[in-house]
Amino acid sequence: MASTLQVSSRKCKNCGSTDFVRDISNTTNELICKVCGLVTEENSIVSEVTFGEASNGAAVIQGAFVSANQAHPTFMSHSGQNALMSRETTLNNARRKLKAVSYALNIPEYVTDAAFQWYRLALSNNFVQGRKSQNVIAACLYIACRKERTHHMLIDFSSRLQVSVYSIGATFLKLAKKLQIVKLPLADPSLFIQHFAEKLELGDKKIKVIRDAVKLAQTMSRDWMYEGRRPAGIAGACLLLACRMNNLRRTHSEIVAISHVAEETLQQRLNEFKNTTSAKLSVKEFRDDETEVNEGERSAESKPPSFDKNRLKEKKIKDSLDTKEMLETSEEAVSRNPILTQVLGAQELSSKEVLYYLKKLSERRKAEFSRIKATHGIDGEDLHKTEKDKKRSLDEIDGYSLEKDPYRPRNLHLLPTTASLLSKVSDHPENLDDVDDAELDSHLLDEEASKLKERIWIDINGDYLIEQESKRLKQEADLASGNTSLRKKRSKRTNRNQSSASIVKVQVDGLPLDVSVDDADAVDVVAAGGVKNLLQKTTFSKKINYDAINGLFGQK
């Protein structure tokens, strides 16, 4: 089945005819030229909304809508829910949160778009699942800021999102490893200088301070102070020096508040800059020195701070050792002594490690010296004196003793001991003569004040004392007359295995009676007396003959 139609705006590419026919008998819906039979159109896509009828008679929309930012159409499942709704919802929420954080931190829009692409990659690699969305969003924004070289730091995202900076940093490192981001540029401290200067409110001198701070940062880069340091600490130190150069007093606390580094870190950067050649220049000489900074080359005189630190440590160790037994050059000493090689070759050594290696070295030298004496038969007072001097010089290095704890206080013997303190305390509990306390002395009363206080207390509590005294006198009178209401508690059987004798407790005339019996008749007599006594005390009925109770057990 085919329908004929004429399309004036369409011409056949083969014959130029405008007479076409559409084949609606198959699913391809082809448009064919009637003259030459050329298929000019098939599987045509229309943008009209068409409706169909479901099996239950309901009207349904046929087709799918593809938006401008979608790569696939949105399909509907059997339950009527969107199959791609969850992913699209996650991306939309991420875009909204990225824009909110970017607006709060003044991040440009193009950086936000780049961060959204990083978030899309993280979502495709299943990195978002199981992690806090705030950490992932902050990590994506930080990567985009590092790529675009903006002045934003991790601490800025941490302050805005109220999340731990270490948590964001851990997420950032894992994301960079997951996405294989290996060429992430280092943060330039010059980027943070202008950002920090705006917070200091420098006024008219802000431009001049920024210019001097940037030049100081370039000088520190030439002097090997960039590597291994936080850029915020470098920028804070440069800004502090630039303020001092322009007669603006800014304290360490103000720089710490805007750069988010510790005050010790800031002071350490200043101490490292003090040891450079640029620190010896005056302000005018530093500003006029343009060629050395613009070249950007590190001169041979400038060395990293760690290099000078290790050289000072080596010199300290060499001076502490005995120079008579040291070799002529340090190269020969390093090549012949493996322990000294380990000491001098290490980059960072603590004081305890240095003392440990020196002690090992001294032991080996002592053993070697003893072996040489035993081999050559050398013995004398000079050698004995030399050995004692060597032992004294090796036992104390840098003022520390190898046998004693260098951190133990030396004035502990001046403190009072426990025995001396206890000897001053009197054994008498009421003797307060040895108490030397002005506040306690003010609370102790003399004899007259004590009697006055006693009279006042008796007047206040007189009724209570009279009542207690009357109770005591009444109890004594009752005991003297025998009028007591105390009852003896029933004692438990001391021996449960007694078969020949038993103890029966009955109440006769209000008094307990302990009767020891050996036969059953005596028990019956006691039981009858107890029942009779009970019935006589409490009369249950007038129709009962209480005298007949004596005949219940054969009594007359």
UniProtKB/Swiss-Prot annotation:
Listed transmembrane segments: none
Region Interaction with TBP: start-end pairs: 284-556
Compositional bias annotation for Basic and acidic residues: 295-309
Top-level taxon in the UniProt lineage: Eukaryota
Pfam families: BRF1 (PF07741), TFIIB (PF00382), Zn_Ribbon_TF (PF08271)
SUPFAM superfamilies: Cyclin-like, Zinc beta-ribbon
InterPro entries referenced in this protein's UniProt entry, alphabetically: BRF1_TBP-bd_dom, Cyclin-like_dom, Cyclin-like_sf, TFIIB, TFIIB_CS, TFIIB_cyclin, Znf_TFIIB
Family: Belongs to the TFIIB family.
Role summary: General activator of RNA polymerase III transcription. Interacts with TBP. Binds to Pol III subunit C34 and to the TAU135 component of TFIIIC.
Protein name, per record: Transcription factor IIIB 70 kDa subunit
Organism: Kluyveromyces lactis (strain ATCC 8585 / CBS 2359 / DSM 70799 / NBRC 1267 / NRRL Y-1140 / WM37) (Yeast)
Gene (UniProt): TDS4
